[in-house]
């Protein structure tokens, strides 16, 4: 990490910090946006606020007893096991899985992807991915390429982040065992046609894995309809739960081909030195994150009561309003799709006449607007979009945002591009 004290063209004494992914400008001036309150436009990183009841459920559990399941022979442990099972069943229903036993809990989707890829792929295997993938996919694949001799190809991806089923099919060869794609881009919000891609995989007898980090809780996902064999999810984004809890769902056919890579106590078959083969114990060794699971349960209850379709429509309305406002501002480029067709509530902007890090800094310092700037842990996506290595300023919205906040965001973007002192 390098530090370089500078004086910005905006006149602020600040420190530029380079982290290897993004330059960050830390200013010393008071934030003008604070008077009207901060505006959180970084829900693609983690949702805020969390669903009602999440914090309370977790706090009550910790205060009253987070008893380990499959260990204690007493009422509190049995009650906790029932609540964990309820959460599995809610997730199985959400993703249209055949059984709640297919739901595996992990610390998050990156953990899930690593467990799966390292337990499934063998020397000589070939994988097809899209050109929009996150490093949670690409880094494990690259490591396996170097250490296990697997190979992967990137399906043709448009400058708007679009990937067709035909493009995926063209990359499938005789050694292809897996197609792995994200459902929605964390950079520009483009939604991939997973049902069409799943049909291609079924036709070629290839396993199909989907990263739902940016779509779960916003878009309807049907594992069976889309022929999904592995579905990775995180609890803290669209599902509106706490950080540190996520997981995956796995089909029986794929499960038979995956070795568990984390072994240990499960509370079952304790007389054996070998890992249990049945689900979910096969992949759930050690003490589980029970506060995280209970927080996720509260979040899923909110989603069920509110309705994912309702949440999606509210997000789409806010995003469409923002897109309409920023598209016509001189000195700003909307990256990716220019309309709401096949996209989520994520908008990436490029400021050609200034450093994007400075733009994000000014949005927060001057107008109290929190965004994310840089490469978003997805350099492959930025290469596809033509924004590498500069990156973008990403705005990602929640149904908890308001029309007034969107208007303030548009006005802030307009002002920083109009003020020549910033350039």
Language model feature labels by segment:
Residues 13, 18-423:
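Pyridoxal 5′-phosphate
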């Amino acid at each position: 990490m390098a530090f370089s004290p500078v004086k910005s063209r905006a006149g602020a004494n600040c420190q530029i910090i380079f982290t290897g992914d993004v330059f960050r400008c830390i200013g010393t001036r008071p934030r003008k946006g604070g008077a009207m309150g901060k505006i959180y436009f970084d829900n693609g990183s983690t949702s805020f606020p969390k669903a009602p009841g999440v914090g309370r459920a977790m706090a009550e559990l910790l205060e009253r007893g987070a008893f380990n399941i499959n260990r204690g022979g007493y009422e509190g442990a049995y009650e906790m096991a029932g609540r964990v099972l309820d959460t599995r069943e809610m997730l199985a229903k959400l993703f249209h899985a055949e059984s709640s036993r297919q739901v595996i809990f992990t610390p998050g989707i990156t953990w899930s992807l690593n467990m799966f890829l390292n337990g499934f792929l063998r020397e000589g295997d070939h994988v097809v991915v899209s050109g929009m993938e996150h490093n949670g996919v690409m880094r494990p694949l690259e490591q396996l390429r170097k250490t296990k001799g697997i190979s992967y190809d990137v399906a043709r991806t448009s400058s708007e982040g679009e990937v067709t089923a035909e493009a995926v099919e063209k990359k499938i060869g005789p050694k292809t065992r897996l197609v792995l794609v994200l459902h929605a881009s964390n950079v520009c919000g483009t939604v991939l046609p997973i049902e069409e891609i799943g049909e291609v995989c079924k036709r070629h007898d290839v396993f199909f894995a989907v990263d739902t980090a940016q779509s779960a809780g916003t878009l309807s996902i049907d594992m069976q309809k889309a022929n999904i064999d592995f579905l990775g999810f995180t609890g803290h984004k669209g599902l509106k739960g706490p950080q540190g809890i996520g997981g995956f769902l796995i089909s029986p056919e794929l499960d038979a081909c995956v070795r568990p890579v984390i072994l240990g106590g499960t509370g079952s078959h304790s007389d054996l030195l070998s890992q249990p083969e049945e689900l979910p114990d096969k992949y759930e060794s050690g003490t589980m994150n029970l506060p995280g699971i209970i927080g996720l349960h509260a979040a899923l209850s909110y989603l069920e009561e509110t309705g994912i379709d309702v949440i999606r429509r509210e997000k789409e309305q806010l995003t469409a309003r923002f897109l309409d406002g920023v598209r016509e501002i001189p000195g700003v480029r909307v990256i990716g799709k220019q309309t709401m067709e096949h996209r989520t509530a994520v908008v990436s902007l490029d400021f050609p006449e200034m450093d994007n890090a400075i733009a994000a800094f000014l949005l927060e310092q001057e107008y109290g607007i929190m965004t994310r700037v840089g490469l978003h842990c997805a350099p492959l996506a930025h290469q596809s979009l033509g924004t590498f290595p500069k990156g973008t300023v990403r705005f990602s919205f929640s149904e908890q945002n308001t029309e007034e906040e969107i208007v303030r965001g548009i006005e802030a973007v307009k002002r920083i591009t109009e003020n020549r002192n910033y350039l």
